[in-house]
Amino acid sequence: TLVKDIITGIFIQFENGMNTGDLVTIGPLTGTVERMSIRSVGVRQDTGAYHIIPWSSITTFANFVRGIGSVVANYDVDRHEDLDKANQALKDAVAEVMAQEEIRGLIIGEPSFTGVVGLSNTAFTLRVTFTTLPLKQWTVRFALDTQVKRHFDLAGVRAPVQTYQVL
């Protein structure tokens, strides 16, 4: 196992798959790489838990620092709401997010409005997507959710109400 740890570790490090400070998911664990040695990687979760993971036990991993971030935002709207009114409220919210300089600087390109991506007995779902700088998808999403809530409220666009049928 020691030889396998070393060989796997060399390949991952040679391929520059992760570096100290990167946010990664390895198996069920997501955290920040704090240490890399010839035999293992140390990952700290946001709960504070520190995990030492032997290189040989890593079959796949995701690195959130490489390349780009992505926001896929779905918003459920009461099925009886006017689709055009809901779409306009979403577009107004996105325009306000894009007008915020500190947020706009985190976004690559323009947002993409997909439109209706889901339909149920109680709701339809609208989607907008953004490409962001690495690790900035959450900042963009928080700003977007705040503006969507605000603009949906201003336009009177309601979320679906859960109903229960008692038999």
Residue ranges and their predicted role:
Residues 2-13:
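Membrane-spanning helices that line or support transport/gating and their immediate boundary helices
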Residues 4, 87-91, 141, 145:
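Hydrophobic face of alpha-helices
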Residues 5, 71-72, 126:
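Positions in alpha-helical segments
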Residues 11-105:
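Soluble accessory domains appended to multi-pass membrane transport proteins
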Residues 81, 101-167:
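Solvent-exposed, non-transmembrane regulatory segments of membrane-associated proteins
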